[in-house]
Amino acid sequence: MDKLNKITVPASQKLRQLQKMVHDIKNNEGGIMDKIKKLKVKGPPSVPRRDYALDSPADEEEQWSDDFDSDYENPDEHSDSEMYVMPAEETGDDSYEPPPAEQQTRVVHPALPFTRGEYVDNRSSQRHSPPFSKTLPSKPSWPSAKARLASTLPAPNSLQKPQVPPKPKDLLEDEADYVVPVEDNDENYIHPRESSPPPAEKAPMVNRSTKPNSSSKHMSPPGTVAGRNSGVWDSKSSLPAAPSPLPRAGKKPATPLKTTPVPPLPNASNVCEEKPVPAERHRGSSHRQDTVQSPVFPPTQKPVHQKPVPLPRFPEAGSPAADGPFHSFPFNSTFADQEAELLGKPWYAGACDRKSAEEALHRSNKDGSFLIRKSSGHDSKQPYTLVAFFNKRVYNIPVRFIEATKQYALGKKKNGEEYFGSVVEIVNSHQHNPLVLIDSQNNTKDSTRLKYAVKVS
């Protein structure tokens, strides 16, 4: 019955019973902990005494003195504090700072000789070099370009150095040589420019050589040679070269003056005959004379006479401009020959249109039946068309004419195509060899031989 009653007890009552049991356990544990605290020694638990410290600080010192030795407090207050602070200030600061100062000086010194590594005297003046190194970078930044130009002029500086034999003075001169020669170089670079105008004045001296008219041809080349040797002389030598052809032009127009007073047509032929003679002279002469003579012709209007002269020569020489009409004649002759060969053939339909040709092949209704007709476009590159019948379809194959080789080929231009000397050869070849037929609509290929010739009624 007791078990049944316990089962039937509602859950709320069970929870209340559990809460009471937990509360009782906590109360019992609290009593046990209080008993343990009373049994403990007052000395060791320092933390609870600090939390509940109600006594004076004097009592606390007495408690520490009773539990622990007095030797632990004295070294912290007197001996250890003094001994720990003093050595840190004396030994640590003095011994650690000097070495980095020495290393910095060692790093600076090797960098200086690299800037002047080519000079040997700088090694003895390493101590004096650092102050100069600070002043040098300001100046060499911009004159570095001129200093490179100064490298070509060390001779004047070398002449000044032997004048001062003592070595300590050489060091001072080396330092001065790095700054002063920059100014000297500017002066030395300007002096040649000042000296250059006198040779410019000598240029007209070359013009005086033109006085002898016969030797003017020989004197003109040296002026050009001098212009090639020096870049400054080019602009000035070209100026005297221009007036030099003027006297030559004065001599040579004498010949056109003889031709100009005779403008009539019969004399024009004489003028044409006289032209090749100076042309041959120009070929034998130098190119420089050609350039001088070229400006002489336009005022005399000789090229006007030269233009009508070559016009009749072009058709004679067979130039490409005139070849067009001449090639048309051989084309017509070849077509006439082809027509003569094709007229007697049973498969040649002549000027038959496409519709009538296809109707004739459909009436025959035989695979391999064919005929050849003239192309409807009347194109010289595609003069004929081969019409073939196979599998109830009619194929129109163009016959191309190749002007370069004067041969014939079937279809569009392709690699490995066959060439024939005439249309008759095409028919004879494909009567024994199959002809490939391509249907562009269905993308199909067939082949047949030309077996049955068809006539158009």
UniProtKB/Swiss-Prot annotation:
Chain residue ranges for the region called Disordered: 36-306
Predominant subcellular localization, coarse grouping: cytoplasm
GO BP annotations, alphabetical order: B cell activation; B cell receptor signaling pathway; intracellular signal transduction; positive regulation of gene expression
InterPro entries attached to this UniProt entry: Immunoreceptor_sig_adapters, SH2, SH2_dom_sf
Subcellular location: Cytoplasm; Cell membrane
Protein name as it appears in the record: B-cell linker protein
Effect of R373L: Abolishes binding to CD79A and SYK
Record SUPFAM superfamilies: SH2 domain
Reported function: Functions as a central linker protein, downstream of the B-cell receptor (BCR), bridging the SYK kinase to a multitude of signaling pathways and regulating biological outcomes of B-cell function and development. Plays a role in the activation of ERK/EPHB2, MAP kinase p38 and JNK. Modulates AP1 activation. Important for the activation of NF-kappa-B and NFAT. Plays an important role in BCR-mediated PLCG1 and PLCG2 activation and Ca(2+) mobilization and is required for trafficking of the BCR to late endosomes.
A Gene Ontology molecular function term of the record: protein tyrosine kinase binding
Source organism of the structure: Mus musculus
Residue spans of biased composition, Acidic residues class: 57-74, 172-187
Domain SH2: 347-454
Superkingdom of the organism of origin: Eukaryota
The protein's assembly and partners: Associates with PLCG1, VAV1 and NCK1 in a B-cell antigen receptor-dependent fashion. Interacts with VAV3, PLCG2 and GRB2. Interacts through its SH2 domain with CD79A. Interacts (via SH2 domain) with SYK; phosphorylated and activated by SYK. Interacts (via SH2 domain) with SCIMP; this interaction is dependent on phosphorylation of SCIMP 'Tyr-120'.
PTM description: Following BCR activation, phosphorylated on tyrosine residues by SYK and LYN. When phosphorylated, serves as a scaffold to assemble downstream targets of antigen activation, including PLCG1, VAV1, GRB2 and NCK1. Phosphorylation of Tyr-84, Tyr-178 and Tyr-189 facilitates PLCG1 binding. Phosphorylation of Tyr-72 facilitates VAV1 and NCK1 binding. Phosphorylation is required for both Ca(2+) and MAPK signaling pathways. Phosphorylation of Tyr-96 is required for the binding of BTK.
Biased amino acid composition, Polar residues: 207-218
Modified residues (Phosphotyrosine): Y72, Y84, Y96, Y178, Y189
SMART domains the UniProt entry points to: SH2
Tissues with expression: Expressed in the spleen and weakly in thymus, no expression was seen in liver, testis, or brain. Expressed in B-cell lines representing different developmental stages from the pre-B to the plasma cell stage, but not in a T-cell or a fibroblast cell line.
